[in-house]
Amino acid sequence: MLVTILALCSGTVFMSCSDKENTDSPQIPEQPTMPKITEDFEDFATWVAAAVQRCHPYISQFWNADAEQGNFNLLLTNEGKNKLYLINAEGKREIPQSEWDDALNRGLSEVESAGYYFLTFQNRYCCLQIHSMESWEAMKQIQQMQKGTTPALEEWGYYMLHTLYHESFHNYVQDLKSWTKSGSSTDREQSYPVNYEPRIYRKLAFLALRKAWEEPAKASEQYVRAKYWIQKYETQYVEEAGSIKETDIVEGTAEYFGRNVIHAAFPDYELLYGTEDYNLSGLIDDESYQLSVAVQLIRRDGRLDEAMKAFKNMKATPIDFLLKDVAAPKNYDESQDATDVAKIRAAMDKQFSESNPYMAPVIALVKRHNSGQAVYLVVNNSNQVVYTSTQGYYSLTDYPGFTCLVNLQASYSRVECMGITVLSWKDYTLFSLADESHLELTDLQDIQEERSPFPNVKFNKKATLTAVNNEESFKMKELPVQVKYGTDELGNKYYVCQ
């Protein structure tokens, strides 16, 4: 699961449903009055606790018995990580440090990487989160970049609620109830350079379903439109459609669940992704979240119980289940979608350009590699990962097996990196250096040429690495270390830690 600041999209008024899943909904108790929210940790924790008490009663309304209230517990700590509250349906309880165990202390040391951490604490499944003003500032910057507006502090609170319900759904409904191991999905990588056509087809299907939600009287018409585009996608891009299926199910259902639980308690919270440019320019797995609208429509159509069985058995994605009885049109006039296609293309042109601060380092790294001027310090991280989080994966079409990780924050046993873009190859992470002068090497020796783990790279030297200079974006934890050295057919240089 990718860890990104929650997309804050245009609001949609929640439509009450008359389907059978609603008829047996529990009576929701009177909602507590919300306290004032401020940046102060105590005030913020009090607000979150009241919000959780508002949201929890809706858990069973939007999913079946697999979603147990007792498995949705929040551990909230402050920026100094010296205060901790357990928050759930029972209220808010401070946990004194005398009760902190090894699992919790490990979580506290790692929570800043992804913003959350799962653990079992005092026989409860818990989601640990940190009230970090640095993360709040990052969220504000992203929204200002996307929408040009400053989000209210409540939206930071909503983000924490969304993390609690969405991510706990992965861990304590999907994984715990033997769905699929959601954390092991390997199909989320966006190919680079980006082929616009499959992205456009899926986004057109999303736009059709959004219109079906907004205008129920025209739902049948929009279902046909969505069926055409999703079938064209699945026919022309068979391999990609098969590989993204699991993520469509896993993220689509978790997004549906998390947004509904919060929106039911807070109607100003956006139920669905909007259709703004930044939502039309995302990567392949962004679409998996957006297509959660299909689960909303399944529920509105009264078929959620049946769909749950299909999702659990990984038989159908939300959009395929929704449209399984819809006939694809034989003669569809694609020109009617020309305006939407142009809008999507323009949004993607902006997204995948050097003007995007998250895309610029990817473009620069690939250009440097293509030129043969790259210098990599390479670390094997197999069985050494402490934590990792990234804001995007790009599989490099021109270099099969290589993946570009955007804004990676990671801790390995041998290296720590702080928000940089790197390459990965199997269990190896490749840190790009400005030049070789950053490496202090001793005992440089020629060796008999030998094969390396990397394609078209042969080792011909070895040395002892004693220091890495002027690199603020990552640091080596273990020095000195032995390295072997080689080049690829383009001239790029690889210093591989042994």
Residue ranges and their predicted role:
Residues 162-175:
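Active-site recognition of the HExxH zinc-binding catalytic motif
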Residues 7-35:
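Bacterial Sec-dependent N-terminal signal peptides
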Residues 93-157, 468, 488:
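Active-site scaffold of zinc-dependent metalloenzymes
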Residues 28-101, 158:
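N-terminal mature-domain "stem" immediately C-terminal to a signal peptide or N-terminal signal-anchor/transmembrane
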Residues 1-2:
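Bacterial N-terminal signal peptides that target proteins for export
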Residues 238-334:
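Active-site-proximal alpha-helical
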Residues 120, 175-240, 244-270:
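Post-HExxH zinc-binding segment in Zn-dependent metallohydrolases
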Residues 43, 47, 310-498:
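Non-catalytic terminal regions of proteins
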